[in-house]
Amino acid sequence: MQDIMTLATPLEKLHGLRNQDDEDFLDGSQSVYAPRICSVQPGHTEEEILQLHRKHVGHFVRISENEVSVSHPDAVKQILQANIAKGTFYSMFSLPDYHYINQMSELDPTRHIQKTRNLSAGFSLSNIAKTEPYIDTVLQLFQTRLNELSDSATPVEFQNWFSFFAFDVLGEVTFSKSFGFVQSGTDIRNAIANTGSLVYYISIIGNYVWFHYLTLGNPIFSRLGLQPNSHIFDTCLLAIDSRKKNPEVRHDMMQRWLDVRATHPERITEQDIFGAAVANIGAGAETISATAQAVVYYLLQCPEYLKRAQDEIDAAQARGELSPLVQYSEAVKLPFLQACLKEAYRFHPAVAHNLPRVVPKGGMTIAGRYFPEGVLVSVNPWIIHRNPDIFGPDCDTYNPSRWLQGETKKMDAFLIHWGTGYNQCPGRNLAQFELSKVLTTLLRDYEIEQVNPKNEWKFETRFLAVPYGWPCKIRRRQRG
């Protein structure tokens, strides 16, 4: 049973927002209150808010005491792409505590942009390409484990295996050290489960940041090792300490950051490096897992798309264009496979949460609606991605072909699964890199079907929308 907690407040109590002549604003004058929904038990805040926007044909829906969800297309440029401060919700992402401010948790746009510049070398596509041999080490082991599961007819829980793969790849690329998840085939020290619990905690306590500073955000908790994902933190700390003692240069992210520190110590501290490493892994792995699952799941729901994707891959294989360990440069030349991935970004964005910004001094006007200084205005990728004016009348269906038909620039401009503007995800190049490789490998080498084809997957919106509960049978494909 879905149990939700809501905060219903008439808009007229929020000074400066009431305008009863404006039907585009869902407010108290319509006897409908907009809920602020927290997933205490399994719930779908993204669908709740989407339906409020649609039901009342409103671009503006109040979702908390001081926050308005905006679905108008102009919101992407005026809110997310503007250099205005983020809401305090983001400070929850300082891990392991508030001393470690990373790009995600930095609220001030100027300081955020400076951090991005200092860390950008590690995230560049050219640097990630140099780490491909490390990614291949994990990919090869991943193939071995899938072969074992295939040979033993053991059902595959992709929510686990994609997470294992993503965490280990991120460990290798960030500081050349795998976490060992794929090797063990288990969630070591419950690190992944605890990461999910932490995201759940953030989705609720993010509304009460002061409480976070008294509990998990308090440095005392991290010093005592009471953080829920200590395996991730411990591995990061050991890797940084080992790298400082080891003069060997590796082409990983940490080496690039250490190079910046050696040349310009005033620009980047060890805390910055540790914070960036933890954020890269903690925020990156589950978003990659959610997206990989979305591609496979929706291809299974649409057999014609699955066949088309595998036919494209088989043709490339027959032409000798795919290596035993698929290279990124090969995978990006598969247009339908890339369209399937892009459609998964749209149809099931891993971040399905409203992204808040603070209206600056002097207020701002969005689509004719004035918002006073200090009000939170937020945009949800899930809602923008289901706008029929942007993505067409079939926006509620998974259709990779939309990305191969005619002009796609308008859709590209509103594809915000990695965010946009100064707060765009710094790890997006790496995510695209490893997703392209692992999905091509999976579809080339295995036949996949759900154990119970009639059962739908499950997911809850807890900032991230990471699916689970759709076990699959796999078997090695026989190619001519």
Name what the model sees in each region.
Residues M1-Q114, D136-R145, F165, Y201, ...:
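N-terminal membrane-proximal hinge/A-helix region immediately C-terminal to the signal-anchor transmembrane segment
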Residues P303-K307, M411, Q424, R428-A465:
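Cytochrome P450 heme-binding "Cys pocket" and the immediately downstream C-terminal segment
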Residues G87-P96, K130-A292:
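Cytochrome P450 heme-thiolate monooxygenase catalytic core
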Residues A153, R243-L258, Q310-K333, F347-R369, ...:
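Cytochrome P450 fold signature focused on the C-terminal beta-domain
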Residues K55, H59, E65, A262-E266, ...:
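Cytochrome P450 C-terminal beta-domain/meander region
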Residues V379-E407:
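Conserved cytochrome P450 K-helix/beta-meander segment immediately N-terminal to the heme-binding cysteine loop
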Residues T287-L300, V438:
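Short, small-residue alpha-helix embedded
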Residues E132, D136, N190-S197, L300-V351, ...:
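Cytochrome P450 I-helix active-site segment
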